Amino acid sequence: MQIHKLCIFVLFISLLSSKTISAVKFNFNRFDGTNLIFIGYAELGPATDGMSRSGALSMTRDNIPFSHGQGLYTDPIPFKSSNNTSSSVYSFKTSFTFSITPRRSNPNPGHGIAFIVVPTVAYEYDQDSTRGFLGLVNLTTNGNPNNHLFAVEFDVFQDKRFGDINDNHVGVNINSVNSKVSEKAGYWIQTRTRGKNQWLFKEVKLSSGDNYKAWIEYKNSKVIVWLAPAHLKKPKRPLIETQVDLSEVVLETMYTGFSGSMGRGVERHDIWSWSFENTAKNN
């Protein structure tokens, strides 16, 4: 009888230990450094007085040319049930407000920011990841499938080496800074002309210093991206909608956050708010 009870107890403990919480949901209305990992030159952004903090997560420092950095959520996040490439990827969605602000004494922008999903926390600062590499990869690692990198870039410098369509675009990247698909930055609004509904595209300038909001969703092997000025609601029509199978890209757990870099064209890259949610269930 005692042995029977012991077996039941061991089984109960085993079941408890195997049950893990996979779903993740968080929201930052502003940043104070809590639950964040800072890599490279990433920091809590300074306020205009130069002493206090603005509440932003900053990827670069406008007084340091060629600076770049990453700001990541502290905990690894489940992205699929196992590392097997056949495992389906959990749906996820994220939204954030950001601004890219050139330094007044040097109005030429460069280079941009990206929402990222990466396999590890890269504590070793890579000096070669600056400029058009957006703090993500370097000339040697760009395009390597072992990067296990997913990113949506907001690029304000046309680097023809990477096939950039212009100096003001949004792109979806897999293991590389060469975008799988990209569109000029802007948003769609629906208008009515002569009794007919029509879509009108309104371009925005990412490096204007204005606040913009982005929404990114992944579901059923499809990436969907919306962009609009921060004071507007999410547009009904997305900027980008493309088929992307992340099952061979993401691992069972990944880190998520932002990266950014600049060259001689000094600018600030600030994230002002951020929410993230995946649809994983308890295992």
UniProtKB/Swiss-Prot annotation:
Its main location: secreted. Keywords: Apoplast, Glycoprotein, Lectin, Phosphoprotein, Secreted, Signal. It is found in: Secreted, Extracellular space, Apoplast. Gene3D superfamilies: 2.60.120.200. GO terms for cellular component: apoplast; nucleus. SUPFAM superfamilies: Concanavalin A-like lectins/glucanases. It comes from the Eukaryota. Residues 24-277 are annotated as: Legume-lectin like. InterPro entries: ConA-like_dom_sf, L-lectin, Legume_lectin_dom, Leguminous_Lectin. The modification Phosphoserine is found at residue 247. Residues 1-23 form the signal peptide. GO terms for molecular function: carbohydrate binding. Glycans are attached at residues 84, 138. The keyword Phosphoprotein applies. Belongs to the leguminous lectin family. This is Lectin-like protein At1g53080.
